[in-house]
Amino acid sequence: MQIFKFGGASVKDAAGVRNVAKILENVGYANTLIVISAMGKTTNALEVVVNSYFKEQEKLAENIQVIKDFHYHIIRELFTDENHPVYWKVDGLFAELTSFLERNKSPKHSFVYDQVICFGELISTTIISQFLNDNGIKNTWIDVRNLVKTDSNYRDASIDWEETQSNIRTHINKSLLNITQGFLGSDANFFTTTLGREGSDYTAAIFAYCLDAESVTIWKDVPGVLNADPRYFEHTELLHKIPYKEAIELAFYGASVIHPKTLQPLQQKEIPLYVRSFVNPTAEGSAVCNVPELEPKVPCFILKKDQILLSLSSRDFSFIVEEGISYIFKSLHKAQMKVSVIQNSAISFSVCVDNKFDTLAELLERLEERFKVSVTEKVTLYTIRHATPAAIQTVETGKTVLLKQVAADTVQIVVA
């Protein structure tokens, strides 16, 4: 069995949906499960809905209408029959979204976020499943929330592997083409949970692990895994073969092509991960697999923008040792801060973090009880794997270096 994953960019419009059908016809879809993300920038648009629910109720209906208009435009291009069942199915999903927002009593942002954000994937898979069925690619639509079970850590849930594997092996018919949603799960109370932004790759890996799949293929708008993001670097190179360990390192440091959690379940069963272009589906792409070293072995650049650099120092010039460092990390964990790089000396501690949950104020309140804290926002973190002097110079030229850390062949540089 094989697992395919199509991200939002691949299904951002009617042409993208038709291209998915063409790819399936050309590469084959027997014994396949397809994981699909929300269309285009729908997740971002649903985040606007969540924010307006909490802060600008008067804009709530308008923001939902924007998402409706976007999807109905795609539906009208794909389905000529105005009485097609896809209309009432999508109508029902939007009604469910509106009903939740009217009934909800929870003040918890992360809980509301997950109950709202899931509609992007539910709507996209409904449209695509219907279109494929109409065009001779018969498939079964599956609500992934009935299969992937998690804890209740909304927005970044952890998988209950035992229950999830039992559900998937019981309910997935390997002989059929199955279509399901990425990024989503549900907790013990059947409330929707999410696996972290860009978590659809992880969903594909979960299914691959549980079904002992032969491979996972992620279809993207790039030719494969490049050694740098072409939006920010010139003369990028395609990485043809990547060892699992190297891919995990790249993902950990923030390489955007592969979700960090995706690789661990695949490595455990040595399931190869292919990254291929939906623009040029006949091209070979990249393979993450059981090879001894990176091919070609070149410096790899990872860029993370909009980071926050926190510089802590003790108020009385006492050492920042185990107890103080423990307090710092407990505070970071409580604020759901993702640590990108740390550096410490006897009386100072610097940490670069990703404030994706908007909890900086909460974190500072705790840290300032114990330390003097300096905050530098909007910094950029560069990580270079297999760094060379020339690669380091490429990053540092013309920039103000705030922090630099060198470990083996990995260099991390924070710049203003």
Where are these predicted regions, by residue range?
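Nucleotide/pyrophosphate-binding catalytic subdomain
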Residues: 1-255, 263, 389
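Glycine-rich beta-alpha junction loops
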Residues: 38-40, 222-224, 277-282, 292, ...
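Conserved dinucleotide-binding and phosphotransfer motif residues
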Residues: 135, 269, 335
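Electropositive, surface-exposed helix/loop patches at the edges of structured domains
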Residues: 172-187, 250-274, 311-325, 376-396
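A conserved active-site cap/scaffold subdomain adjacent to cofactor or substrate pockets
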Residues: 241-289, 294-296, 305-307
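A conserved regulatory-domain signal marking ACT and ACT-like small-molecule sensing domains
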Residues: 284-416
